Design a protein with these regions (language model features):
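Sec-dependent N-terminal signal peptides
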Residues: 4-13
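N-terminal leader/targeting segments and the immediate start of mature chains
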Residues: 16-57, 70-71, 203, 208-213
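Gly/Pro-enriched, hydrophobic low-complexity segments
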Residues: 19, 126-205, 210-213
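Extracytoplasmic
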Residues: 39-41, 60-62, 69, 83, ...
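Beta-turn initiation residues at beta-strand->coil junctions
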Residues: 48-50, 79, 92, 170-173
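An acidic-aromatic
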Residues: 62-110, 179-180
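Flexible, surface-exposed loop/linker segments and immediately adjacent secondary-structure boundaries
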Residues: 103-137
Length: 213
């Protein structure tokens, strides 16, 4: 009985901790966000893994992102996603088609231009610990959505303690899937024209255009 009471007490403490807006976590998140905003534009190579222990899923691929303000271009093995802040293009080379849609800034889909400030709205945050990851000391912070029906129930961010850049982040969904993005190469303050963030049909003659707007 005493054991059950003790376990219940620990659960209570854990839930209470996650209900807080941890000032230590906020200080790190604010510093990280300010750093990326000051860059203007950046480019990053990354690895992506999808794991699910129950379904025995373990997938990995590499990609590249270019971000400038609200605009981004995401190059993946089987698709390229381009967003100019208003319109979203998804180019599928194997299908020889491009889907065009209006950009929804409130979508729960992974958005490279928003991950650095996602904590500012509808999330609670908690500093967990300092941990050495890949030889780099990182501050580990959990973001927990305030909405119970959110697509992801937790996002864990590993932020480099020395310079407040993002080392990696993992998104946990209710189906047991874990989506991990790890930055493998980072180039800040790059020069890139706004036209880079718009799909150019001249580069893909004969492609089928599917306009979903």
């Amino acid at each position: 009985m005493k054991h059950l009471v003790f376990v219940g007490f620990l659960v209570f403490l854990f839930q209470d901790a996650l209900s807080q807006y941890d000032p230590k976590a906020l200080a790190t998140l604010e510093a990280m966000s300010a750093k990326f905003k000051a860059m203007g534009a950046f480019e990053a190579n990354f690895s992506y893994t999808l794991t699910n222990d129950v379904d025995n899923i373990n997938e990995e691929f590499k990609g590249k992102m270019t971000v400038k303000g609200d605009k981004y271009r995401l190059a993946l093995p089987e698709q390229e996603v381009i967003n100019n802040g208003t319109t979203l293009w998804t180019y599928l080379p194997d299908a020889n088609e491009v889907n065009i849609d209006n950009y929804d800034p409130n979508s729960e889909d992974v958005n490279p231009s928003k991950i650095f400030e996602i904590y500012k709205k509808d999330f609670k945050y908690l500093y967990l610990k300092d941990e050495t990851i890949g030889g780099v000391v990182c501050e580990v912070i959990d973001l927990v959505p305030e909405k119970t029906d959110a697509q992801f129930f937790k996002i864990r961010m590993n932020i480099v303690k020395r310079d407040k850049t993002v080392k990696s982040f993992t998104m946990f969904d209710k189906g047991g899937n874990r989506y991990t993005y790890t930055i493998t190469e980072f180039n800040p303050n790059i020069k890139v024209d706004d036209s880079f963030f718009a799909y150019d049909p001249k580069q893909h003659p004969g492609v089928e255009i599917i306009d979903l707007r």
